[in-house]
């Protein structure tokens, strides 16, 4: 059997996958823009509307999101964390100090969360359904954090990772509840969130002492 036809077939498959991935990202970017538009109610946003906004056919959009908006929410987390992982891996190639890697990981997640804005707020409150449907992130962020903590202090890695995880989720919950019209929740702005996440590592290491 000649190997050349296989190479051509592999090339076609790679191009098809690249096209699929490009369209998928275009659709997700469209969804993020719509969810962050204050003039549009999130409940009114549909797969069809996302497709129209992206300049993609509705049939193509449903090929990417067969289970409606649940697929969109899952993709927001998946693509968002992929971006974080790519940035972290590039940073790790520079052989940083273990503490710098942990801080960079947390800061990168926080910046990605802020970048996605209301889209991630809306998706977060569907997280149970996302997990149950198998559309959650491939590679749990906590596992990445724990691995980074082991590089920092192998003996107390579990406790350090747990403390960081709790502090991070506390900040994230408050940011998720941000509401400019309500005094209590109005202070948990994007700036507040990024600043407080940046302080988590120092707070967690103090708890360990």
Regions found by a protein language model. Name each.
Residues 85-89, 128-163, 191:
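Amphipathic alpha-helical packing segments from all-alpha helical-bundle domains
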Residues 26, 34, 38-71, 75:
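Helix-turn-helix
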